[in-house]
A protein has these predicted regions:
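Alpha-helical hydrophobic helix detector
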Residues: 13-33
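Transmembrane signal-anchor/signal-peptide helices with a preference for the extracytoplasmic
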Residues: 33-39
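Alpha-helical membrane and juxtamembrane elements of multi-pass inner-membrane transport
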Residues: 9-12, 25, 66, 169
């Protein structure tokens, strides 16, 4: 049979657990958010590299923006990827929640629309003039460099961490390869 002292100790342990459990849960979900951020950062780096490989490969049919977008989509494991302005400009705008934007440009592109850019598209694309807020298309040829950039908007699930980061973290990864054609 329990004594009065045993019951008091059990009650004290229950109160201590009630005080500590919110902190433990916050730490647990914070670790989950950090794990998600590391996973997505690695994923977008890999997707940018694979997209750049597709953009520069020599084959019977030269690659297009659609080929690069398809490859990046397949590497992003169900995360939606779109290309609102495939040839840029690469701006500081934020993609929709938990989705990514793809850009295929010259290395170190400017943040403004380019009317006459250096080669900034896969060789299978057709030349096109600047259109609204999108840069002109100038297909690469003759061993030029292309940069594939993926910008991803990660929305965090831990409320306290999300408030500290304005509810999201925008990650960006880029790969620069030289064309083979």
């Amino acid at each position: 049979m329990g004594t009065r002292r045993d019951k008091a100790q059990r009650s004290q342990a229950l109160i201590e657990f009630a005080l500590v459990s919110p902190v433990l849960l916050l730490l647990l979900f914070g670790v989950v958010d950090i794990g998600r951020a590391i996973f997505y950062y690695d994923t977008i780096n890999h997707a940018a590299r694979e997209g750049a490989r597709v953009a520069v490969r020599a084959s019977n049919q030269l690659p297009t923006n659609s080929d690069v977008l398809g490859t990046v989509n397949s590497q992003m494991l169900g995360t939606p990827v779109t290309a609102p302005c495939p040839q840029g400009p690469v701006t500081g705008a934020t993609p929709p929640d938990n989705s990514a934007w793809l850009y295929i440009t010259e290395p170190n592109p400017p943040g403004t629309v380019e009317a006459t850019p250096p080669p900034n598209a896969p060789g299978g694309e057709y030349s096109a003039n600047a259109n609204g807020s999108c840069s002109a298309v100038n297909p690469a040829d003759g061993n030029k460099q292309l940069q594939v950039t993926v910008r991803f908007n990660l929305v965090l699930i831990t409320p306290v961490v999300a408030q500290a980061t304005a509810n999201h973290i925008v990650m960006s990864a880029a790969a620069v390869f030289r064309t083979e054609y």
